[in-house]
Amino acid sequence: MHKLFILTGPTASGKSEVSKIVAERLGCTIINCDSKQIYQHVPTITDQAEYLRTNPQFGLYGYVHPSNSYSVGLWLEDAKREILLAWEKKSPAIVVGGSGLYISSLIYGLSEIPPADAHIRQKARALLSEVGNDTFFELLLRRDANVCKIDRRNSNQLLRAFEVFESTGVSIFSWRERCPKKRPFENCEVCVLFPPKEELHPKINSRLVDMINSSAVAEVEYLMSLNLPADAPIMKAIGVREVIEYLRGNISLPEAVEAAQRNTRQYAKRQYTWLRRQLPQDAQFLPTREEMVQHLVSRLTETEK
């Protein structure tokens, strides 16, 4: 039986660099599991190095237009296809990224809830944009008391709950009970690159400086030209909100960098918590890139024997 390897970890921990080294040594296939690195035309703000977009060993990087509607369900179907293609070619597959919802769907599966029509999705986005998260949450709570389980700051979960109720008249939580999850792959090994926070923070800070000194501002200008809704997934990429504030003249560029660094450190903190609590008990946590490379090369070599 094939074994699927999943490499995850907080932002800026070095997952892409590890995957590049392992791919070069073993010729394996790398499949993206970062919900922002799927997007085209914005490589700087999504931290897509050129090899991620051009090397045929790397899949699901930079292939979705920023204005296109895309979901975890669509990603999971794309990922399953890429994984099976790799195995058909006798290539080990490693899924790499830090997006919790994508990782969870791959490990535990998704409930088969009916998709919402496009006009209902539009209606939900327009309402959220008009009233904001708090009011949207309260409106939804009146329809479905179980919505109290959702973090009102999580726009994606609020929108999905609204869409499901509006489309079917049934709570998304009831659908999940009716349609239990089915694991896409039974044989998964999860590896977590988990550096100490005090080592990660300087890397986050320097990454944001490098982004701004590169083409991040131009990429955000491009996104603004598309007139995307504020809650579009790509508009939540690291640094986008802060650069928009700079471009609108509300803050200086150094203030935008400082705010992006602070917000990214807070995001990494949430990732640390999620990774500790939501992954299988046998997930392998390692603190350094070197240890992770050695571990993956060893495990992949053993598995392929």
Curated annotation (Swiss-Prot):
- Provide the residue positions that the database annotates as binding ATP: G9, P10, T11, A12, S13, G14, K15, S16
| A GO term, aspect molecular function | ATP binding
* Highest taxon of the lineage: Bacteria
Quote the catalytic activity from the record: adenosine(37) in tRNA + dimethylallyl diphosphate = N(6)-dimethylallyladenosine(37) in tRNA + diphosphate
Signal sequence annotation: none
Q: Where is this region: Interaction with substrate tRNA?
A: 34-37
Site described as Interaction with substrate tRNA, located at: S99, R121
InterPro entries xref list = Dimethylallyltransferase, IPT, P-loop_NTPase
**Name under which the protein is recorded:** tRNA dimethylallyltransferase
Per the UniProt record, the source organism is: Anaplasma marginale (strain Florida)
Q: What is the lineage of its organism?
A: Bacteria, Pseudomonadati, Pseudomonadota, Alphaproteobacteria, Rickettsiales
Q: Which gene encodes it?
A: miaA
